[in-house]
Amino acid sequence: MDKKYAAARLLPPIDASYQPARSVTKIPATSSLEEILEVLERDGGVILTDFVPKETMDKIDEELEPYTKTIPDSDSYDDFIGKKTLVIAGLISKSDTLANILDTNETIDKLLKIILEERYPAVFEGHTEELVIDPLLSISMAFHVGQGSPRQALHRDDMVFSSKHHPNMKINEVDGFSCFIAGSNVTRENGGTMVILGSHKWEHDRRGRPDEVSFLEMERGSAFIFLSTMAHGAGYNTIPGEIRKIMNLVFCRGTLRQEENQFLCNPRSKVLKMSPKMQTLLGFKKPAGTWLGMVDNDDPAKDLPAIYEKIMQ
């Protein structure tokens, strides 16, 4: 990365006197899909309270504990995260409990189908077929944000896909969405993510401004679902000795390249034990009727053990 951009990606905190005009909407995780979609359509993001029970969060903490010993001291993501934030990558292979949440959560499953599932007509000489391409898990990672970790420049996550935006984009036109799960209480003071409500419907070239942001504040176990078109950025943690913990599951369309190489970051022993649904999310299954992801002209998910055996020779 050109070093002239490094300083522009990590910034000082927003003045403490600034007060947002709006707060991020919170609704129970048990809310209907219609209620969740209504807020997503309007604001671009919504907090779902009590998304993960306390006992389950405790189990995730226990599973991730071995990976928290590394002292963050490198410029992760080309100076886009900062030296005082620990990043735990490949999260679903490090926490079976989190992987199970992804495998079994009906809300995430329904949102994936509505927002990111591709259904389109394929036109042949004498007929037309409807093809379906399943969404993918783009990346799974945890952030442990320490005191003094700077705020990120406001940005949109779908920039990694070279996505283009236009005013009033429909929810099923976006290229991705994220699910933040709070591993600790999240406040403005400990660096709660800055979000600009409504920015998911901006024109492509509009830049977010600090005087437009609201702050993500939620309790441990809550989740924040937001579209990849929403302008946001990590906040500045000002509290000595306090770590803000966020687990991030990012999803994308099945026609896009995943941000994290799921084929290499998930151990074979883990993948072979996963459900067909999880293998599909990672990209190991060829979408029915299409030709994406073939191995030897066939669907690798038909016999993954044999495929692994062959490539390990």
Curated annotation (Swiss-Prot):
Superkingdom assignment: Eukaryota
Record's keyword terms, sorted: Dioxygenase, Iron, Metal-binding, Oxidoreductase
Pathway(s) annotated for this protein in UniProt: Mycotoxin biosynthesis
Name listed for the protein in its UniProt record: Dioxygenase swnH2
One annotated GO molecular function: metal ion binding
Binding site for Fe cation: H155, D157, H232
Cofactor(s) named in the record: Fe cation
Binding partners and assembly: Homodimer.
SUPFAM superfamilies (alphabetical): Clavaminate synthase-like (SSF51197)
Record Pfam families: PhyH
UniProt key word Oxidoreductase: yes
Top EC class for this record: oxidoreductase
InterPro entries linked to this entry: Fungal_Metabolite_Diox, Phytyl_CoA_dOase-like
Function: Aminotransferase; part of the gene cluster that mediates the biosynthesis of swainsonine (SW), a cytotoxic fungal alkaloid and a potential cancer therapy drug. Swainsonine production occurs via a multibranched pathway and is dispensable for fungal colonization of plants and infection of insect hosts. The first step of swainsonine biosynthesis is the production of the precursor pipecolic acid (PA) via conversion of L-lysine (Lys) to 1-piperideine-6-carboxylate (P6C) by the aminotransferase swnA, the latter being further reduced to PA by the reductase swnR.
Record-listed E.C. numbers: 1.14.11.-
